[in-house]
Amino acid sequence: MRNAIEIHALTKRYGILTALDEVSFEVGRGELFGLIGPDGAGKTTLFRLLATLVAPDGGTASVDGLDIVADYKRIRERVGYMPGRFSLYPDLSVGENLAFFAALFGVEIAENYDLIAPIYRQIEPFRARRAGKLSGGMKQKLALCCALIHRPAVLLLDEPTTGVDAVSRSEFWDMLSELKGKGISMLVSTPYMDEAVRCDRVALCDGGKILAVDTPQGVVGRF
């Protein structure tokens, strides 16, 4: 199986608004693929479709070879998803959040600790602190650990560094580069071109449409 994600004419409407308009592209296995575009471009809608949280109104898509409609339950076992807003439990500690998500996926933390260890070691000194009391950068690292705890084949990250400082942003992308080296396929949205250039390829989107798919340098050259 060559592609981790395949999207063909995917469409989503909310009433009279077409949030996604026949979107098509592929993410190769082991690829770090960026989705770049302004607010309202349809990025979050696409992530929600791929994470099987909403159903499409047209077109098809597959994640890790599984159809997002017919195989939605199996996809949820194979995908790690970080939504744009912090979605962990603010009143649970760092350690409790991680344990909760491990239990949710039916795994033991020790099973996949090698995957999250480089990230978790940075927040482990705060493991007793409530998640809601962490800094923005620490929250994102915890959310990434929770998204990885079941060792997903595909990682979906919706603007994971929005609202965090420049140093934390750079550290986060360093972590993504390490995960790519471990064979995890990733689709990451970002409003920042300095982040997009760290991707293998990017899709430029606006108004629910894909305007271009190319290397970051290729997209810059065309626009």
Which functions belong to the PLM regions below?
Residues 59-70, 75:
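Conserved ABC transporter NBD signature motif
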Residues 130-134:
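Conserved ABC ATPase signature
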Residues 144:
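Hydrophobic anchor residue at the start of the ABC signature
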Residues 155-158:
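Catalytic Walker B motif of ABC-type/P-loop ATPase nucleotide-binding domains
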Residues 213-214:
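ABC ATPase "signature
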